């Protein structure tokens, strides 16, 4: 599986179709459809700054919370607009977990294959972002919440193009969540844990170095409790920061403000 993630089919222009475009809120927006190598499509929205650049780039990958209205690529739209207005090319993307029923439809037999496909799709989104005119490859941030953060770590350990990371309310091991449903016991459970250990974020987060990392966690998060957060953070190499907020799994407005400020400071040229 790791070889499939490494030797992926790179994105070509023919894989992307423009659905709609317009200018508002001080930036240009483009709604796009991406054809994947796996026979299905993914939506994304591109936010382009005004001016000549060069521009930093940010890939935003949302969380999974089926009871929340922003458990999809809409989660980071407002943030992407703000960052684009201040000089960053931003892309918000559809994922496997954009489907509210994704978790109950899958089984552990699907998780490794789904993970491989998700990493390939993320790498192809990176291809697209860095192919934008005036994109600065030396200022490329990956921002991921929940599964978005976990798969970002895995993708980034293979694809070293992102130069900065914000990892939000992520857990260090996929079985922490993928064993919620369906229930596994005994040898099948242990076999699954062993299988997924090859791609667990905690096994790969050190490979993001020397990219600066910002970890954001809530102090009342049942899915990424403080103990797991500290283990995950401890496995990462410097430079790194971890912030704990008075929040649950969805984090807080305070964390949003801190994240935007961190990105602006790290990527430079964003006022």
Language-model-derived ranges and their functions:
Residues 9-52:
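N-terminal cap/lid segment of alpha/beta-hydrolase-fold proteins
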Residues 44, 54-65:
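Short beta-strand element of the alpha/beta-hydrolase
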Residues 64-120, 177-180:
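Cap/lid segment of the alpha/beta-hydrolase catalytic domain
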Residues 123-183, 187:
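Primarily recognizes the serine-hydrolase "nucleophile elbow" in alpha/beta-hydrolase
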Residues 190-205:
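Active-site nucleophile elbow and catalytic-triad environment of alpha/beta-hydrolase enzymes
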Residues 208-209, 214-217:
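Short beta-strand/loop motif that positions the catalytic acidic residue
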Residues 222-228:
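Conserved alpha/beta-hydrolase "acid-adjacent" motif
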Residues 234-271:
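C-terminal catalytic histidine-bearing segment of alpha/beta-hydrolase fold enzymes
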């Amino acid at each position: 599986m790791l070889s499939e993630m490494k030797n992926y089919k790179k994105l070509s222009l023919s894989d992307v179709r423009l659905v709609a475009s317009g200018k508002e809120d001080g930036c240009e927006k483009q709604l796009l459809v991406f054809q994947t190598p796996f026979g299905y499509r993914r939506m994304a929205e591109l936010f382009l700054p005004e001016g000549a650049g060069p521009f930093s780039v940010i890939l935003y990958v949302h969380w999974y919370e089926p009871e929340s209205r922003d458990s999809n690529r809409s989660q980071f739209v407002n943030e992407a607009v703000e960052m684009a207005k201040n000089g960053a090319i931003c892309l918000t993307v559809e994922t496997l977990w954009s489907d509210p029923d994704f978790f109950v439809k899958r089984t552990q037999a699907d998780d490794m294959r789904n993970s491989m496909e998700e990493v390939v799709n993320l790498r192809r989104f990176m291809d697209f972002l860095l192919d934008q005119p005036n994109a600065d490859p030396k200022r490329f941030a990956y921002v991921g919440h929940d599964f978005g953060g976990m798969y970002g770590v895995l993708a980034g350990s293979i694809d070293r193009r992102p130069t900065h990371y914000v990892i939000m309310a992520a857990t260090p091991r996929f079985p922490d969540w993928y064993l919620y449903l369906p229930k596994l016991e005994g040898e099948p459970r242990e076999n699954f844990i062993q299988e997924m250990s090859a791609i667990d974020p905690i096994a790969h987060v050190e490979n993001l170095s020397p990219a600066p990392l910002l970890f954001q966690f809530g102090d009342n998060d049942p899915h990424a409790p403080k103990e797991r957060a500290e283990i995950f953070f401890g496995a990462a190499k410097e430079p790194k920061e971890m912030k704990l907020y008075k929040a649950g799994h969805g984090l807080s407005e305070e964390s949003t403000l801190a994240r935007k400020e961190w990105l602006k400071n790290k990527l430079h040229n964003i006022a």
